[in-house]
Amino acid sequence: MAIILGADAHGNALKELIKSFLQEESYDIIDVTDINSDFIDNTLAVAKAVNEAEGRLGIMVDAYGAGPFMVATKLKGMVAAEVSDERSAYMTRGHNNARMITIGAEIVGPELAKNIVKGFVTGPYDGGRHQIRVDMLNKMA
C-alpha cells in the first residue's frame, strides 16, 4: 500500500514526522509536497495521486485541516475526512471507506498524529451496510 503525503508550510514539520513514522512501519511513501504552494495545490496533488491507483491512501497536513478537507471532497471519487483523534481516523476507514484524511498541525501534536495515522492506515473497510453510504458519497462529486 502506498501512502501519499502532502503539506503546506504550516504542516510540513508534522508531515515529516508522519513520514518518518510510516517509513519505520515499512509503508511505501509518495511525498507530493511543494513547500512553496498553498494548501489547495498540495491537497489537489495528494487527492489526484490517491485516485490514480487502488490501494492508495492520502494524508494532507496544514495548520487546521479544514481547508484541505473542503478541497479534497470537491473531487470525484474522493472520500475524505478531517480528523483530530484516533477513533475518528479508524472509523472513517471502517464505515466511510475514506481514502484521505486531513490533519491540522496546530491542533494535533506529534504523538497523537502518529496514533491518528496508525488508525487510518490499519483500519479496514467494513463494507456491508456501509457500502450504501459509500455509494451515495461517490455519486455526489
From Swiss-Prot:
Signal peptide: none annotated. This is Galactose-6-phosphate isomerase subunit LacA 1. It holds the Pfam family LacAB_rpiB. Gene3D superfamilies: Sugar-phosphate isomerase, RpiB/LacA/LacB. Heteromultimeric protein consisting of LacA and LacB. The keyword Lipoprotein does not apply. One of its GO terms (molecular function) is galactose-6-phosphate isomerase activity. The keyword Amino-acid biosynthesis does not apply. Its EC number is 5.3.1.26. Coiled coil: none annotated. One of its GO terms (biological process) is lactose catabolic process via tagatose-6-phosphate. Keywords: Isomerase, Lactose metabolism. It catalyses: aldehydo-D-galactose 6-phosphate = keto-D-tagatose 6-phosphate. Belongs to the LacAB/RpiB family. Pathway: Carbohydrate metabolism; D-galactose 6-phosphate degradation; D-tagatose 6-phosphate from D-galactose 6-phosphate: step 1/1.
